[in-house]
């Protein structure tokens, strides 16, 4: 039961893990021979203490995000436009971005090709943004999540948005596109990997279709590969996500 408890804990199911750690203690198990993390404790009592701290936190976070999912509109958004203030200073135009991200002007045929390959309808808000610029690194490269607690991540880094020009490495169907992250890095198959982060693949931003189906309006989530692929809800839709992006303090000082 100790192995099962560890597996649950590493899958961000601390509330369930707590029960199994307690069962292990009742059976007389005091220490764990091998742990999955170098800095993890070996004492079962220490694991129980950890789980007792994190179990209520996990329950609170899951409840909060479940309510957001239930309230949000899952029907596809139509006629989406971005405010000028949102677009102002959004992109970062360096040599790498132009070479590896930025594609040719996006067409309806490009969107249809990507949708067919990935099996999902792209949000109209994403298409609207790609018609303005077909992918690129972001100058507004931070997003504040809705779940604000002093024990969890509040600000999420976003390095760039993947476009629909498959000749670019960092595009939805490019060399380091959505399928690459799902098939090679084993990210959960819940939708489309839409944005990278500064971790180089150890956490990603996804369009999550798990509660709306492939033709619905996906929400935007953060997935932490290093944290057992923990999913954190960010925004009801892609437009709200882009609207909420902001630059680092250093970039703000440069304006």
Task: Please describe what each predicted stretch is.
Residues 64-200, 249:
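A surface-exposed partner-binding patch
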Residues 7, 51, 55-58:
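Residue-level signature for tetratricopeptide repeat
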Residues 1, 27-44:
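Boundary/linker segments of alpha-helical solenoid repeat arrays
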